[in-house]
Design a protein with these regions (language model features):
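Start-of-repeat signature of ankyrin repeats
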Residues: 73, 106-107, 140-141, 175, ...
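Ankyrin repeat A-helix N-terminal signature
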Residues: 46-48, 79-85, 113-119, 147-154, ...
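Ankyrin repeat domain, specifically the short helix-to-loop turn at the C-terminus of the second helix
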Residues: 58-64, 90-98, 124-132, 159-167, ...
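Solenoidal tandem-repeat scaffolds enriched in leucines and small polar residues
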Residues: 138, 150-211, 219
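Ankyrin repeat boundary signal
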Residues: 68-69, 99-103, 133-137, 168-171, ...
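Conserved ankyrin/ankyrin-like repeat signature
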Residues: 55, 87-88, 121-122, 153-157, ...
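N-terminal segments that cap or nucleate solenoid repeat domains
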Residues: 3-93, 97
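Cullin-RING E3 adaptor/co-adaptor recruitment helices
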Residues: 3-24, 30-31, 271-284, 288-429
């Protein structure tokens, strides 16, 4: 059809009309490699060699008035950009190469190409010569910063772009920022993007950024943790868990709220629903001050106490295994106490009740936990509870465990402050 023609026409023009000039220029910059073939990729590429660069100048002077000179010199810039040949790029710019020239196939500009090939020095050269540092490509709408944040290998370009003043919070039309790109590209196969995420956060990336689809910084962490249960080796699962923990630490350190609404985007809510599986991360969230209720609407929207008892009853109605049950109850008790100890007044949903009749096993233990919670809600708080809340608050930030162990207090008090029913008694004190 008519609409497809310009693209094909542009594609053919590369091959037919300005390709000879491009080939001649690149041929001058190549060095003969061992196979007798000229190679641009070889590390011995002597792009600083004066005679090569003089030869390039002579060709450009000779061809200045030839048809398609502008396209040829601009396309050559794309190619030397990919190879990181700074002196050659400088000459091409001097001879009129267009910084906004788009590759006829990918529609990337030289700056995009420099980032994709991780050439920070070329990135700097292009920006200093006036390349638009925040320009989005036509196909994917990615900025140079987006591309730099997607691969750990491009960290040098990411650092350079931020130093050169790239807008760290620029977003595409769907609201996706470079930080959301970095998080989204940290999929299970490739989870080493922590440094990029850290660099963006230190550069002022907004932790409250969200896409039009409602994806937030925690969407990707939740997705990865959910994936962990499937088809991974033990080692891969540990890698994912470590990565998610580290990223959550970074996000919280920069003010992210893991207890937001809707519940589907709340990391706290996600961990509460399966507290047995994500216990260390959940402990970290609570000890770092995350709300155990919806931070926007309070316990009427969702409540950590409600979710915890639901989880306990559901599992205890299905599994009879004694070690499994006792581990679950210990973690449940620890979780309930962590939530109780996070503030002086506890917040429960109104008319909060727990029906333990569904628990086929250990219903009485769950009932006891529930009664201690209701007791705390109804009566004036005991001094020891208030002291625990106060001391733990003073020992923040996370982790508070080692700080408690260092206090000049009797072991029994330390144990009460530590809140860890999964630890075997007092041996570690």
């Amino acid at each position: 059809g008519q609409s497809a023609m310009p693209f094909l026409h542009g594609f053919r023009r590369i091959v037919l009309e300005y390709q000879p000039l491009v080939d001649e220029l690149l041929g001058l910059l190549a060095t003969p490699d061992t196979g007798g073939q000229s190679s641009l990729e070889s590390p011995a590429c002597l792009d600083s060699d004066k005679s090569q660069l003089s030869a390039v100048r002579r060709v450009l002077e000779r061809e200045t008035h030839s048809p398609f000179y502008q396209e040829g010199v601009s396309y050559a810039l794309l190619k030397v950009t990919e190879l990181g040949l700074v002196p050659a790029a400088e000459i091409l710019l001097e001879f009129g190469a267009d910084l906004s020239f788009e590759d006829p196939v990918t529609y990337y500009t030289p700056l995009h190409m420099a980032v994709l090939r991780n050439q920070p020095d070329v990135v700097e050269l292009l920006v200093q010569h006036g390349a638009d540092i925040n320009r989005r490509d036509r196909i994917h709408e990615s900025s140079p910063l987006d591309l730099a944040s997607e691969e750990p290998e491009r960290l040098p370009c990411l650092r350079r772009l931020l130093q050169l003043g790239a807008d760290v919070n620029a977003a595409d039309k769907n609201g996706k920022t470079a930080l959301l790109h970095a998080l989204a590209s940290s999929d299970s196969g490739q989870i080493h993007n922590t440094d990029s995420i850290c660099l963006l956060l230190e550069g002022g990336a907004d932790v409250t950024a969200a896409t039009k689809d409602g994806d937030t910084v925690f969407t990707y962490v939740i997705y990865l943790l959910g994936e962990m249960a499937y088809s991974y080796t033990e080692e891969e699962a540990e890698d994912i868990e470590r990565f998610c923990f580290r990223v959550t630490q970074l996000l919280l350190a920069h003010g992210a709220n893991p207890s937001q609404c809707p519940a589907s985007e709340s990391l706290t809510h996600f961990c509460l629903k399966s507290f047995k599986d994500y216990f260390p991360l959940l402990r970290f969230l609570l000890e770092s001050g995350a709300a155990y209720n919806c931070s926007l609407h309070g316990p009427s929207c969702w409540s950590g106490f409600h979710i915890a008892f639901e989880h306990l009853c559901w599992h205890l109605s299905r599994f009879d295994d004694e070690t499994y049950s006792s581990d679950l109850i210990q973690k449940g008790q620890t979780l309930l106490e962590l939530m109780m100890a996070s503030s002086q007044a506890i917040q429960l949903p109104s008319n909060f009740e727990v029906n333990t009749s569904s628990c086929r096993f250990h219903g009485e233990k769950v009932q006891t936990l529930f009664c201690s919670l209701k007791q705390l809600e109804r009566s004036p708080q005991a001094l020891k509870h208030l002291c625990r809340v106060f001391i733990r608050q003073r020992l923040k930030p996370w982790p508070v465990g080692d700080k408690i162990k260092a206090l000049p207090l009797p072991d029994r008090l330390k144990w009460y402050l530590l809140i860890d029913h999964t630890a075997a008694g007092h041996e570690d004190l």
